[in-house]
Structures are given as C-alpha cells and as structure tokens.
Amino acid sequence: MNKAEKACEELKAMDELAAMSSPVHSMQPLSKLLLTVFYIFVTVSFNKYDITGLFFMLLFPVFAYQLAGIAVHTCFHKLRIVMPLVCAVGLFNPFFDKNIIMYIGSIGVSGGVISMLTLMMKGEFCLMASFLLVATTSIEEICRALRQLHFPKLLTSLLLLTFRYISVLLEEVAIMTEAYHLRAPGQKGIHISAWGSFLGQLLLRSMDRAEALYESMELRGFYGEFYYAEGKASNRFSWLGACVCAALIMLTRLYNIPALLGSMFM
C-alpha cells in the first residue's frame, strides 16, 4: 500500500469515526460548532504567562473524548504531522524574552520559556477541539451548520466538494504511482526527471474526472448550491449541554482555578 492509498484509508477512518454513536455524536451540529469556536476563542485569550490557568482547559477536550468514545491518542496519531509544526512556532521565545519571572527551587525560569509552553499548549488544545468536531460530525452536517450561520454557499460547497473528492485525487495518485513502480521496479520514490510529466498527467486525469463528476451533478439538478439533508431533530438537551460547557469554560477563564484550589488547602 503506497502513501496515497494510506491517505485514502485515513479519510475513510474519519468517516467511520463520525458515524459512531455517542452523546457527543448525537448533539446538534450547530451547537458543537459554536461550542468549539467558543472554546478556541477562550483558549487563545489566555495571557502568555498564565500557564496554570491554561492547563485546566485541557480537561474539556479530554472529557469530551471520553464521552464520545474516541481515544485521545487517536487525535495525536491523526495529527502527528501538524502538531509538531504547531509546537515549533514558539521555539524561539526563550531567546527573545529572558526575564526571570518564577523560580522552581533555585532554578530560574524565564518568561520566554513560559510563553513558549503556553503557546504550544494553546495550539495543541485548539487542534484537539477541532479534531473532536470533525471526528464526531460529518462534513455534510458541518456544512449545513455553516449555512445556518449564513456562510456563503460558495465556501460551504467548496469545502464539501474538497473533502468529498480529495479521495478521487488520491486514487488517481495511487494508480499512477503503482503504474510508475511497475515500469521502474526497485526504484524508491519517483525520480526527479519524471516529476513534470507525472504532475502533468495527474492534472489531465483529474480534470477529466472532475468534468465527469460535474456533468453528473448537473444531471441531478445541481446549479451552484447543495441541498443538505434534514439535520438531527432539535434536542433541547444538546443545547443545554453546550450552554453548560460554555459556562464552565468561561468560569475557567475568569477565575484562577489553581489559585482557588490552593487557597482552600493552605
């Protein structure tokens, strides 16, 4: 199985996750979308030195993953390429902010180290929340929720088509890669001299498939906007749960929970 085929399997696995049954899966897509956006907004609003307060924001995605029946390590495995890049964003902070702001024993910790860790945590937490939304909500439900928020139909249609038909492009890449390796057995990867013709053939084959798909869509009455199937029935408990979670998130942001807990036991 080549890399393109593995990527197709990854996409199918995401669809299987979204088709699971759990309290999180059964929530209204719009409530999940708004709650995720609210969580991300609150997470990034923490001060760059407030690492203790930010740490408690981890409780919400971890609890939601358990409630959804999805292992947390699944998120880290699926995003194994993106997460290191997010962590790398703040690597240079210790070189620019060298002021000592706290001590661990006799060891001084600079503000750059704290801000680096805070920035990494913000990125990881936001990725975890975003992945949970995609893993518990189908792309059709997400696009329908976006249309309910009056997002432009062009953007929602583009998002849906990109997600749905990226697998078609990957299938073409897999077929062409396999054909290339049959003609060049034992060669690792595709030689640089063949990159131009390979990409050109991929473009032509993709255009042919795209034209055939668009003609099929037109025959089925498509004229610029998808008509999404009826969403889940309105569930007041879904919105109640989302409001409770949003309130807890806001309380975590407004009050220093670690300091309050420390004052109770001191």
Mark where each language-model region is.
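Transmembrane alpha-helix interface motif
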Residues: M1-Y49, G53-A68, E171-M266
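Membrane-helix interfacial "entry" motifs
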Residues: S21, H25, G69-T74, Y103, ...
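Membrane-helix interface segments
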Residues: D50, A71-V72, P152-L155
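Interfacial helix-loop-helix linkers and transmembrane-helix boundary segments
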Residues: G53, A71-L79
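Short alpha-helical basic/polar micro-motif
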Residues: H73, R164, E215
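Juxtamembrane/interface alpha-helical elements of multi-pass membrane proteins
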Residues: F76-P185
